[in-house]
Amino acid sequence: MVKNSPISVIPQEEKRGSVEFQVFNFTNKIERLTSHLELHRRDYLSQRGLRKILGKRQRLLVYLSKKNRVRYRELIGQLGIREPKTG
């Protein structure tokens, strides 16, 4: 599995507490858990953890889309995240 470096996705001056950095970290965790669950389909605790991380990332993305729509669109484009359905 190839990991994206935070430097290529997020500018150097961004802090670790920024919404973009947190979304990036959650995306890496989601990718790792997804590859783990492909091998271990019945690992229900990991499935639950994956759902929790997905929810956290979704809440952060909603927050970012309300605060700064341009940065939101750039981030989902760089990370390859689909835009959520509305309605």
Curated annotation (Swiss-Prot):
Xref: InterPro entries: Ribosomal_uS15, Ribosomal_uS15_bac-type, uS15_NS1_RNA-bd_sf
Listed Pfam families: Ribosomal_S15
Molecular function terms from GO: structural constituent of ribosome
Places the protein is found: Plastid, Chloroplast
Keywords: Chloroplast, Plastid, Ribonucleoprotein, Ribosomal protein
Disulphide bridges, residue numbers: none
GO cellular component: chloroplast; ribonucleoprotein complex; ribosome
Main localization of the protein described in the UniProt heading: plastid
HAMAP family assigned to the protein according to its UniProt record, in alphabetical order: Ribosomal_uS15_B
Family membership: Belongs to the universal ribosomal protein uS15 family.
Subunit and partners: Part of the 30S ribosomal subunit.
Protein name according to UniProt: Small ribosomal subunit protein uS15c
Record lineage: Eukaryota, Viridiplantae, Streptophyta, Embryophyta, Tracheophyta
Name of the gene encoding the protein in the UniProt record: rps15
